[in-house]
């Protein structure tokens, strides 16, 4: 018996008050639907079907990299109708698992428990007990605790309102059962929709075993209906990430002011992360790295014993061991700092390699530049890499010394151990082991008087 997963993702999401389809809104930097797909893939299904509606082609275009079978529900007539669109693509003998694109934190552990504890011919649902179940379908049991049915909130009788055990919507049964039950559904309810939950009563009527598996926590089955619910779930997720990292040996100064936005974040023990740090995409921090406050790291690797000072923004960079960056530094994509390199305050780099032991400490722009080892780049140095049409490369060889306020008009090469005098503007190569100065000689104009205002 193979596993086929159906993810329902066709809801309109009106309460999000957004032009972006709800399932494309991110949690922890990843779209809600993508999170559910990633969890489903951990179960090794042979197929993942996604039933989509609201947002249509926009959803598919944005998430076209996902390994799923897309099925459009042109009319949103309820969850039962949505599953009916996908079930023809499932083999009769398949075990079908139904998930929701706006329930992003469901855990593989809970889903495995559901699959393992549901008889091969039975029906299983994930349930949860909430202090306030308002708006959610209730689990109706008999005097012996057996599940009889699920009643949606709008159809709940007054005496059932006190029930706090709710249906999460997550369900598993065979494809054959669903092919038999789904055509029997009707829309005789307050919402005039075909409820998937009505299959529970049909199963009970047939004598089919129906069981419930409890969620590990309320948050893992929390659906996202509006921005506030998403905000609360985001903070819960970030606390989980902070706890996980802390237990692995990472110091998080304040878990409430830490954000990890990506799946591939690897942090070694003895790393210290100060407040308001954002980690995005693929981030790797080696041992003894220190990240100052208000730092953004995106798709970046940082070597051991390196310190990133406050208010630095770093994207798609490689920073090797024993480096220092910032404060107020910006490293754009393609920046590489070799071991022991130093980038100081108000320095910007793009597509630039700063060699071993080299430093650019202040007020500098380095673009499309290859810098050797033990180079000193003085304050105010600018590589003029763009001529209005094309980008050009600057090369600064080992041991060079660039004075303050120097403009290097690419393409050019500064030779090994060359010295460039402060205030120079170079448009040609500077030879090695020589002092190159390109500025007008200082002069004083005698007898000059400052202009005065006319009376």
UniProtKB/Swiss-Prot annotation:
One of its GO terms (biological process) is peptidoglycan biosynthetic process. Its EC number is 2.7.7.23, 2.3.1.157. In the N-terminal section; belongs to the N-acetylglucosamine-1-phosphate uridyltransferase family. In the C-terminal section; belongs to the transferase hexapeptide repeat family. The active site is at 362 (proton acceptor). Pfam families: Hexapep, NTP_transf_3. Mg(2+) binds at residues 102, 225. It is an enzyme of class 2 (transferase). GO terms for cellular component: cytoplasm; membrane. This is Bifunctional protein GlmU. It comes from the Bacteria. The keyword RNA-binding does not apply. One of its GO terms (molecular function) is magnesium ion binding. It catalyses: alpha-D-glucosamine 1-phosphate + acetyl-CoA = N-acetyl-alpha-D-glucosamine 1-phosphate + CoA + H(+); N-acetyl-alpha-D-glucosamine 1-phosphate + UTP + H(+) = UDP-N-acetyl-alpha-D-glucosamine + diphosphate. PANTHER family: BIFUNCTIONAL PROTEIN GLMU, NUCLEOTIDYL TRANSFERASE. Homotrimer. Its main location: cytoplasm. Acetyl-CoA binds at residues 379, 385-386, 404, 422, 439.
């Amino acid at each position: 018996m193979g596993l086929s997963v159906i993810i329902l993702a066709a809801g309109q999401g009106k309460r999000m008050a957004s032009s972006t389809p709800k399932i494309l809104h991110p949690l922890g930097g990843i779209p809600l639907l993508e999170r559910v797909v990633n969890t489903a893939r951990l179960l090794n299904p042979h197929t993942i079907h996604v039933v989509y509606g609201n947002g249509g082609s926009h959803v598919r275009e944005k998430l076209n990299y996902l390994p799923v079978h897309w099925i459009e529900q042109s009319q949103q007539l309820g969850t039962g109708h949505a599953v009916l669109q996908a079930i023809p693509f499932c083999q009769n003998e398949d075990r079908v698992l139904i998930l929701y694109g706006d329930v992003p934190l469901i855990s593989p552990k809970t889903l495995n428990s559901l699959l393992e504890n549901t008889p091969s011919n039975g029906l299983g649902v994930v349930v949860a007990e909430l202090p306030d179940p308002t708006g959610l379908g209730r689990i109706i049991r008999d005097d012996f605790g057996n599940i009889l049915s699920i009643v949606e909130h709008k159809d709940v009788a007054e005496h059932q309102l006190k029930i706090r055990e709710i249906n999460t919507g997550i369900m598993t049964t065979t494809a054959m059962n669903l092919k038999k039950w789904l055509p029997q559904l009707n829309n005789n309810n307050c919402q005039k929709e075909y409820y998937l939950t009505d299959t529970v009563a049909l199963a009970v009527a047939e004598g089919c075993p129906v069981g419930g598996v409890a969620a590990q926590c309320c948050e893992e089955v929390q659906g996202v209906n509006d921005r506030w619910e998403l905000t609360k779930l985001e903070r819960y997720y970030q606390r989980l990430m902070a706890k996980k990292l802390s237990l692995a040996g990472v110091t998080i100064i304040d878990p409430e002011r830490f954000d990890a936005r990506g799946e591939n974040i690897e942090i070694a023990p003895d790393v210290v992360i100060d407040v308001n740090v954002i980690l995005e995409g693929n981030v790797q921090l080696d041992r003894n790295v220190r990240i100052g406050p208000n730092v953004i790291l995106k798709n970046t690797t940082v070597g051991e014993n390196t310190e990133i000072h406050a208010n630095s923004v770093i994207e798609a960079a490689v920073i090797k061991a024993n480096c220092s960056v910032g404060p107020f530094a910006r490293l754009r994509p393609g920046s590489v700092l070799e071991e022991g390199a130093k980038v100081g305050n108000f320095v910007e780099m793009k597509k630039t390699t700063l060699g071993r032991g080299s430093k650019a400490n202040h007020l500098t722009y380095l673009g499309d530049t290859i810098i050797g080892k033990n180079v000193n780049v003085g304050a105010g140095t600018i590589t003029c890499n763009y001529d209005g049409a094309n980008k050009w490369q600057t090369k600064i060889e080992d041991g060079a010394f660039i004075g303050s306020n120097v403009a290097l008009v690419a393409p050019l090469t500064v030779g090994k151990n060359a010295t460039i005098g402060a205030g120079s503007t170079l448009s040609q190569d500077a030879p090695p082991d020589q002092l190159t100065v390109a500025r007008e000689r200082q002069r004083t104009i005698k007898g000059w008087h400052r202009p005065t205002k006319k009376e």
